[in-house]
Amino acid sequence: MTDNLTRAFKELLNQERFGSQNEIVDALKKQGFTGINQSKISRMLSKFGAVRTRNTKMEMVYCLPNELSVPNTSSPLKNLVLDVDHNSMLIVIKTTPGAAQLIARLLDSIGKSEGILGTIAGDDTIFVTPTNDKPIAELLQNIQRLFENAL
């Protein structure tokens, strides 16, 4: 197994959107890997301890255990953020496991000038409270733009 294949395989699983082994086979083939079949994917899933779990959309998908996919400061932000939602009072950001505090720290550093009063972060969820002078829709757009353009 090549390092490139291993890296691509792990990146696909970290996206948390592949529900079948055949979907993983197809995605790797689209990336140019040859000799990939369902049995090889099955062995790789076992080797890396992948499990099937529900993603934020409640779909059953393959993913790596938390300790293998711990985010770091060089991880692209858009890969760490799974969903951004809001109501009239606050914004809720869903992240990959372990990434919430890293992203909350970034948002706190942006601070009041961008309309962020403060954040509360757990393991994979962040609550963002806007300042009174910034409409929540505008803050939501700023946050989404930040994640789209980051790294």
Swiss-Prot record:
GO terms for cellular component: cytoplasm. It comes from the Bacteria. Pathway: Amino-acid biosynthesis; L-arginine biosynthesis [regulation]. Disulfide bonds: none annotated. Keywords: Amino-acid biosynthesis, Arginine biosynthesis, Cytoplasm, DNA-binding, Repressor, Transcription, Transcription regulation. SUPFAM superfamilies: C-terminal domain of arginine repressor, Winged helix' DNA-binding domain. GO terms for biological process: L-arginine biosynthetic process; protein complex oligomerization; regulation of arginine biosynthetic process. One of its GO terms (molecular function) is DNA-binding transcription factor activity. It is found in: Cytoplasm. It holds the Pfam family Arg_repressor. Regulates arginine biosynthesis genes. Belongs to the ArgR family. This is Arginine repressor. The gene is argR.
